[in-house]
Every structure is written in C-alpha cells, then in structure tokens.
C-alpha cells in the first residue's frame, strides 16, 4: 500500500502497534473516507493465539497460521506513522460478524 493510499474497511494490514506488540496484522474497521481524511484508522488486532473467547472471529485462510480477529480490542491508530501495509482483505461475511460482535459490546440489547 502506497503511503498516500488510505486503508479500506475490510483490509487486513501489517502495522507497528507499539514496542511491546511489535509488527502484527490487524483488520481495518473504519471506512477509507474517514481513514484518509483524519489520518487514523480503527483496527482490531489479529492473533494466532486463538482461545475461543466470544469476541474472537476466526480469520479465513489469509495468514500462514490460523488466526482470529480480536473484536473487543479496538484501537485508533495513525496508519501512516504505523507503516500500514495491506496484505489482503476479508469477505463481507467476516466484516458482518466482526460488526455484530462490536455492536454486542457497545450497544447491547437489554
């Protein structure tokens, strides 16, 4: 992904989280229009340490190892400073599942 090309919702990107987490993949959940205008992107980290937690969504075969999207660990990051590099994208069904899990956290039906 070129430095001027903002990531799109549904993109899987490699980025630098911080010194402790290092480079790792993440799913972009904010739309390109927001990412481009603000310079930030909302992302969910991706892990290969699948634990079966309710807010994990299994990632389709895209990574070398089985991986899961951590829907309860949303981060807002400067995608340029974090050197985001697009490595693929998820199908709409995965984005729908991620969105449903996030909504269960922020707008639970009571």
Locate each region found by the language model:
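Conserved functional hotspots at enzyme active or ligand-binding sites that engage polyanionic ligands
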Residues: 1-110
């Amino acid at each position: 992904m070129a430095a001027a090309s903002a990531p799109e919702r549904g993109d899987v990107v490699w980025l630098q989280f911080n010194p402790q987490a290092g480079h790792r993949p993440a799913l972009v959940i904010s739309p390109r229009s927001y990412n481009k205008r603000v310079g930030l992107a909302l992302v969910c980290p991706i892990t290969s340490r699948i634990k079966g937690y309710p807010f994990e969504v299994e990632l389709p075969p895209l990574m070398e190892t089985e991986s899961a999207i951590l829907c309860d660990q949303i981060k807002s990051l400067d995608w340029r400073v974090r050197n985001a590099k697009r490595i693929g994208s998820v199908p709409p069904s995965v984005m729908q599942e991620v969105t449903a899990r996030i909504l269960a956290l922020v707008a639970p039906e009571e």
